[in-house]
């Protein structure tokens, strides 16, 4: 009976991780769009506009967004790994439970 509760718990955790993964992928996509926007802004702003500070700010923002994209990619990989581990554990528990059930019937 404990294995049933563990299977349910692991399945719920796996589903939660999938939702987190989907959310994280959305964040990666959104931040990539922001990086592209900032690259385009850098193309339009010229030094003769006497806005050197603006260029510096935009470059810093671009770097920050790129760092966020990298962080989200790493987080996605970690979440995916945990989901795979949970899937394996659920499979093992299910097989073990089947063997135990079949052993009792025999």
From Swiss-Prot:
Residues 7-34 form a coiled coil. The keyword Cytoplasm applies. Pfam families: DUF496. GO terms for cellular component: cytosol. It comes from the Bacteria. Keywords: Coiled coil, Cytoplasm. It is found in: Cytoplasm. HAMAP family: Pole_loc_TmaR. Pole-localizer protein involved in the regulation of several cellular processes. PANTHER family: UPF0265 PROTEIN YEEX. Belongs to the pole-localizer TmaR family. This is Pole-localizer protein TmaR. It comes from Vibrio cholerae serotype O1 (strain ATCC 39315 / El Tor Inaba N16961).
